[in-house]
Amino acid sequence: MTDNNHYENNESNENSSENSKVDEARAGAFERFTNRKKRFRENAQKNGESSHHEAPSHHKKEHRPNKKPNNHHKQKHAKTRNYAKEELDSNKVEGVTEILHVNERGTLGFHKELKKGVETNNKIQVEHLNPHYKMNLNSKASVKITPLGGLGEIGGNMMVIETPKSAIVIDAGMSFPKEGLFGVDILIPDFSYLHQIKDKIAGIIITHAHEDHIGATPYLFKELQFPLYGTPLSLGLIGSKFDEHGLKKYRSYFKIVEKRCPISVGEFIIEWIHITHSIIDSSALAIQTKAGTIIHTGDFKIDHTPVDNLPTDLYRLAHYGEKGVMLLLSDSTNSHKSGTTPSESTIAPAFDTLFKEAQGRVIMSTFSSNIHRVYQAIQYGIKYNRKIAVIGRSMEKNLDIARELGYIHLPYQSFIEANEVAKYPDNEVLIVTTGSQGETMSALYRMATDEHRHISIKPNDLVIISAKAIPGNEASVSAVLNFLIKKEAKVAYQEFDNIHVSGHAAQEEQKLMLRLIKPKFFLPVHGEYNHVARHKQTAISCGVPEKNIYLMEDGDQVEVGPAFIKKVGTIKSGKSYVDNQSNLSIDTSIVQQREEVASAGVFAATIFVNKNKQALLESSQFSSLGLVGFKDEKHLIKEIQGGLEMLLKSSNAEILNNPKKLEDHTRNFIRKALFKKFRKYPAIICHAHSF
C-alpha cells in the first residue's frame, strides 16, 4: 500500500482513528498537504498560469510519461531531495541503506530499493557460504592425504598428511579382529609406508585417547620414534601403555599441547580445538598448510550439556570456517543415524532409577576409556550408599590417571578392593568392571563363568552393560549375556535405551559441522564404505559439490590443492596381527596356517625311503587331525601309503637322492590326494629321508 492510500484511508475514517496518535498525525499531514496544493493552484491562476497546472513532479502519476512538470518546481524539489540525500549520507551507518522514495505515488521506486537490499543480502549470504573462494587458485601448493587405517573398517585409525618436504601422522589406533583369526587379539596398521617416509615425519598428532586412535602407538615406537603431540589424558594413557611394553624411556618424545594455541610441526601449523566425544579431552584439528587450511574433526558429537560442562568449541570451528577451509575430514561413524546423538548427561536419570530399585549388587560394565560414564555410575553408587570396587586392569588404570590429572574428583574412602566385596551386604556394593565387549579374559566374563578369584555372579545381581557391541564382537557379547542370564542375574542392556549413548555425531550434527566449516573439498573418514558414502550425501545436501568429494579407502593417496582434488596413487596397506597376551606381533603366514588348520585340518607325514628299492620303510609315520574320526584314520593312512609306494616306483634318481625335492614331491602328492577325497586343502606337515 502506498503512502497516499494510507492518507486517504485515514481521512475517510478520521472519527474512528481518534484514539490513535499515529493515525491523527498521518491525517494532519494529509490535510496540510491538501491545503498547500490548493494555495499553489490559486497563486498559479493569479499569475496567469494554466488552471490545470499539475502538482509537483514527485506527486505525478507514473502512467503520464508525456506530461512535463514546471521547471521551477522540478528544481525546487530536486534541491529538497539533494538536501535529504546529503543529510542521509552524513548520517549513514555501515550495513544500513535509507529509503529515499518515501512519498512517491505508486511502489515502483520503493520496491526497487527493497530489491537492491535483497540482492545485497543474497550476495552476502553466498559469500558467507563460500569463504574458501578467497583462496589463491593459482597456488601450486598441495598436500597429500594417505589413510593407513580407519577407512573401509571401524577402528585402527591412522592417517598421513604430507607435503614434499614434511609429514605428520594423525593417530595410531588398533582394531579388533573378526571371528576366525585364532590367537589374534588386536590388529594394528601396517607401518611400511611410515618407514618409507620416516625422514620427513615431523610428529605423531593425537586427537583423543580411545584405543582405536592410540592403541598402536607402543608397537609403532618399537620400530620408529617421532615427537608425539597430544592433550594430557591422551599422553597419560599412552604413557601407561609404554610402561607395559617396556618403553618408558620414549616418554621423552611426548609434547603436551594447549587447545586454541597453534603450534608449528614441520611445515604445518596445528591447533587443537575442544570437541565433545565419549572420552575426556577430545580434540578436532585445524591444520594450516601453504595450500590451505585443513580441518580434521577426529571422533566427535556436539554435546551442549556434557558431564564436565565443557561443550564443543563451536566458536573456534566457525572462526576457521569464516576464514576459508580448503578441506574437511569428518567422522562418519553414525552417518546413517538421523537426528542428533543424545547428550552423555541424559544417561543420569536411567542410572538413578536402576540404582534406586536394585535389591542386590550393581555390576556396571562399559568401555574403560569412557571415564564420564564410569564417573556417573560411581556418583550414583555413592548417592545410594554403595561401596565401589573397580575391577579390571584397564578400568583401574584409566580411572586412576583421570583422578590424578584432576579430570574427576571422587572420595577415596568410598572405594574397596575386590577381595573386600564379600564383607559388605549386596545392596551396599557397586562393581565397575571391564568386559562390555564379551572379551574372554575380561573381569565380567570371568565373573560370569566362575573363573574370577573373588567374585561370581549371583541371582540377585543387576548387571548393567552400558555399551554397544563393536562390529565383530556381537557373538562374544551374546555369549557373555547367555552366561549372565543362566546365572539368573538381571541384565540391563539394549532394552534400556537410556543406559548408553553414542559418542559419534548423527546426521544433524554432521550437517552443523559442514555448515560451520564450509569446506571447498570434503573427505569423509572413520568408517566402512557404506558410512562414508552416506556422509557424502549429507555433505551434498549442505552445499558441497559432488565433484569436490572423494571416498577413500585405506592405502589410497589423494592430493588436494586450492583448485583440485584427485587420487594420485595407492600404497601398500593392511594389518599386522598382535597377540595381546605377549604384546608380540604375529606373522601373516602364521595366521594363514591357523586358518588352514581350523578350516581343513592337518595331515603329517614323516617318511623314510629305500633309494635302491624305491620303497617306504616301515619306520615311516603318518597322522591326521581334524580330517576323519579315529576309526577312519587307519584307512586314510593306508590309502596315502599305497599311493606313495606307487609314486616312489615312478620317481627318478634325481628326486630320490635329493631330500628337499623328495619332500616337495611327497607333499604335493598328499595335498592332491586329500583334495580329491575331501575337496579341501589341509595343512601338510612333511619330512622325507632317503637311504
Curated annotation (Swiss-Prot):
Superkingdom to which the source organism belongs: Bacteria
InterPro entries named in the record: Metallo-B-lactamas, RibonucZ/Hydroxyglut_hydro, RMMBL, RNase_J, RNase_J_2, RNase_J_b_CASP, RNase_J_bac, RNase_J_C
Pfam families: Lactamase_B, RMMBL, RNase_J_b_CASP, RNase_J_C
Feature: compositional bias, Low complexity: 10-19
Subcellular location: Cytoplasm
Major subcellular site: cytoplasm
Result when mutating K649A: Loss of acetylation and positive charge. Loss of homodimerization. Exists solely as a homotetramer in vitro. No effect on protein folding as secondary structures remain as in wild-type. Significantly increased exoribonuclease activity
Post-translational modification: Acetylated on nine lysine residues. Some of the residues are acetylated by multiple different mechanisms. RimL is partially responsible for the acetylation of Lys-323, Lys-397 and Lys-649. HPB8_1270 homolog is partially responsible for the acetylation of Lys-323, Lys-397, Lys-511 and Lys-649. Acetyl-phosphate-mediated non-enzymatic acetylation pathway takes part in the acetylation of Lys-134, Lys-323, Lys-397, Lys-511 and Lys-649. Acetylation of the remaining residues Lys-140, Lys-337, Lys-547 and Lys-634 occurs by a yet undetermined mechanism.
Region Disordered, annotated ranges: 1-89
Recorded consequence of changing E595A: No effect on homooligomerization
Coiled-coil residue spans: none
Consequence of gene loss (knockout): Essential, it cannot be disrupted. Depletion experiments show only slightly retarded growth with an increase in levels of at least 1 mRNA (ureI). RhpA remains associated with the ribosomes and polysomes.
Binding, substrate: H500, V501, S502, G503, H504
Positions annotated to bind Zn(2+) 2: D212, H213, D299, H526
Biased composition annotated in UniProt, kind: Basic residues: 58-82
EC numbers for this chain: 3.1.-.-
One MF term in the entry's GO annotations: RNA binding
Binding site for Zn(2+) 1: H208, H210, H277, D299
Transmembrane regions listed in the UniProt entry: none
Protein family according to the UniProt entry: Belongs to the metallo-beta-lactamase superfamily. RNA-metabolizing metallo-beta-lactamase-like family. Bacterial RNase J subfamily.
Subunit note: Homodimer. Homotetramer; dimer of homodimers. Interacts with RNA helicase RphA, might be a member of a minimal RNA degradosome complex.
Function: An RNase that has 5'-3' exoribonuclease and endoribonuclease activity. Degrades 5'-monophosphorylated ssRNA and dsRNA, considerably more active on ssRNA. Association with RhpA significantly increases the dsRNase activity. Degrades RNA substrate with hairpin structures at both ends with low activity, but presence of RhpA significantly increases the activity on this substrate. Stimulates ATPase activity of RNA helicase RhpA. Involved in stabilization of mRNA but apparently not rRNA.
Matching HAMAP family: RNase_J_bact
Name of the protein: Ribonuclease J
Source organism of this protein record: Helicobacter pylori (strain B128)
Gene assigned in the entry: rnj
